[in-house]
Amino acid sequence: MTAKFRKNLLLLLAAAAVGLSLYNGQLARRALAARPLGRFIHLRGTKLHFLEAGNGQPLLLLHGNGASAEDFTTSGIFGRAAARYRVLAFDRPGFGMSPRPAGRPWTAAAQADVIDAAVAKLGIGRYMVVGHSWGAAVALEMARRHRRSVAGVVVVAGYHYPSPRLALAISALPAVPLLGTVLRHALLPSLVRLNWHWAMKQIFHPATVAMPFAAMTRGLASRPSQLRSISAEPFLMLASALFPNRRYADIAVPVGIIAGAGDQLFDAKAEAVRLQSEISQALVDIVPDAGHMVHQSRPEAVLAMIDKIAALTSVGDRAEPSRSV
């Protein structure tokens, strides 16, 4: 291979990378433009986007890794819960329309603090919180760190006791500076779109894929900025596995724990039972014929658990606070 040939090859690859980056950027803008716009709240050098509906006891909904607030609208949980609760579905930092500022680790604890601060700025005193998958880790941190605010928790398909796994390390590679930047902008968006159907089958198995969720999330999850957040969360989970600092026994509020019996990502049933053993006021529901996306396949199970946990919270928590920002 001559020096001239190598030079031309590098130029060709660089041009292809730039072209792919521009194309992926255009698709990312289209994906954002296609989603419904909710409200923004600005605080702590960032902003959070959320959807809101209903009246009654405040109920926060936190999505998992790679998703956004629409996870709960497409499942029907958002609309059905709004008949009884004041529901706020957040885009967690780095997902949907909520940015994830660089320069600080967005751990579950950091996300818990900023979301609780946002809720307080909205004038809400006490609330319940539902978290799916990575959102479950944030919900539990909110219960531990903000005891005066959290009245009850429902965790869905949570990986509460992560172990060091090669898959976590590989998933975190796109978060690596320089190399990760090139991958996220040039190569990964196309790979994500090509493998989307396979990924959906894996997380929904043994249930069928919910097409409204799959269609809504595909464009958002393949954006370069969101791919950075998607890959950062396995890195944080790996760090948590290597240096565990879990104190679930500190949680003093009612907690509902839901897991799909057929979850293909990890042993969700064992995770749920172990978590129940650590929390004094915990209820467990292992849902048959459901996988990691149990809230999409069986939303009625999640809604029923929300009502059970709400019934265990004090009556005083049910007063609706001011909506002033």
What name fits each language-model region?
Residues 262-266, 292:
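Acidic catalytic loop of the alpha/beta-hydrolase fold
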Residues 280-325:
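Catalytic active-site module of serine/aspartate enzymes centered on a nucleophile-bearing elbow/loop
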